[in-house]
Amino acid sequence: MAIAIDWGSTSFRAYRFSADGQLLEKRQADCGIGQVSGQSDASRHAWFERILFEHCADWLDQQSITPVAPILLSGMITSRNGWVETPYLSCPVKLHALTDNAVHKTVRDTTLMFLPGVAIGAGDDQNSTDVMRADVMRGEELQLIGATGSSTDTEKSAGLYVLPGTHSKWVDYNAGCLQSFHTAPTGELFATLMQHTLIGALSDKGEWDAAVFRKSVEQGYHSTQFLSGLFGARAGVLLEKIRPQAVSAYLSGLLIGREIREGINMVIVSGEAVVDTAITIIGEPILCRRYTDALSTLGFTSQIPENDMAADGFARLLALM
């Protein structure tokens, strides 16, 4: 039997697998590490231990009958604000290298394996001032392992992968490696604009305006006046060019359109022809459908895997151990 934990800022997801890698059970709780942000290391670590063993106690009790492999942990639990900070592996990264570079910790006679993150620029000169080149991810690589593991043919799994969210990731995966990636803080910017700025202050609740969204996706992708376009959300309401109920769709479209432009440019620079294959989108269903709509508006094809990619990723890693 094996146990794996996907532990992020807002959620805790636990998976139990059989010896042959079949998913037996999944549990989820709103116990993200953000709940203890700002507390002392000792307080946070005690809380992490309590949460882990409370949610997995009955699974661990079975180890007297069925031996339990080390518990795999991925996500922000392995960050500087988590339980054990693990190093970043520099791209390009073969995904099996995650288990090879895991950090081990023993708690209550149970071995925990904290998986590393992935980075761009981690091996650069520490005196380098090229901050815009730096990038990191923790947790998304697990979903990528699941998405690329459906085929043993590395050519079939090669392509561009998008993981939308607070900090969206665009990943160039080919030749069996995570070659490069690009982060766009689209979700965080959208939330900030809507909740904490004058730009979003005139917005109002209402049904999603798909037409406004698609038009602003095109504007965000093609416009050379992106920043002033954001202010258009406020000016447009004042001049009655856009309804207050459509402001969220307008801002979302602008941000996602610009994100797509930057993500596509990342892969074009590396020489990949992204328009020749479907872009794979991994994440929450509603958000994935929004990105599919945006990509379709711009003439790109996309696909959304049906399975739980984190579970598939853990299963693939366990098979390599």
What are these regions, as identified by a protein language model?
Residues Q219-E262:
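Adenine-nucleotide phosphate-binding core of ATP-dependent small-molecule kinases
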Residues D293, Q303-M321:
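Glycine-rich phosphate-binding/hydrolytic loop that grips phosphoryl groups
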